[in-house]
């Protein structure tokens, strides 16, 4: 079964997410960003995000060996990253294939610059 990918609209970061240095964040933006940064405060999750970003899209089964963790542990950490909006998954058979959420990393970078 072939998946259909839709083009992602490209917008300027300034149009959606002002830098914390440019203007104060409202409560909703601050909470969303805090959840994302908190998810990255764990070394395993940070490594998982970097592995997923480097591969563009990766099967959860291929994340076990690089981080030397069990499937339940990797599943827990990818769930945390997904709940923070940093990665998105697509279930294919027994496994989930992960990719970086299109705007998530850019938003974190842009909010600090």
Model feature map: region roles:
Residues 48, 82-83:
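A ubiquitous, low-specificity "background" feature that marks scattered single residues
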Residues 78-79:
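Short, hydrophobic-biased segments on the C-terminal half of alpha helices
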């Amino acid at each position: 079964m072939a998946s259909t990918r839709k083009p992602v609209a490209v917008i300027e970061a300034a149009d959606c997410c002002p830098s914390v240095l440019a203007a104060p964040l409202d409560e909703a933006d601050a909470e969303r960003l805090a959840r994302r940064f908190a998810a990255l405060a764990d070394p395993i999750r940070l490594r998982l995000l970097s592995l997923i970003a480097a591969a563009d899209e990766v099967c959860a089964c291929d994340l076990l060996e690089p981080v030397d963790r069990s499937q339940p542990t990797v599943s827990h950490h990818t769930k945390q990253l997904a709940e923070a909006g940093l990665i998105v998954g697509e279930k294919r058979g027994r496994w989930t294939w992960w990719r970086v959420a299109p705007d998530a990393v850019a938003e974190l970078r842009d909010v600090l610059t």
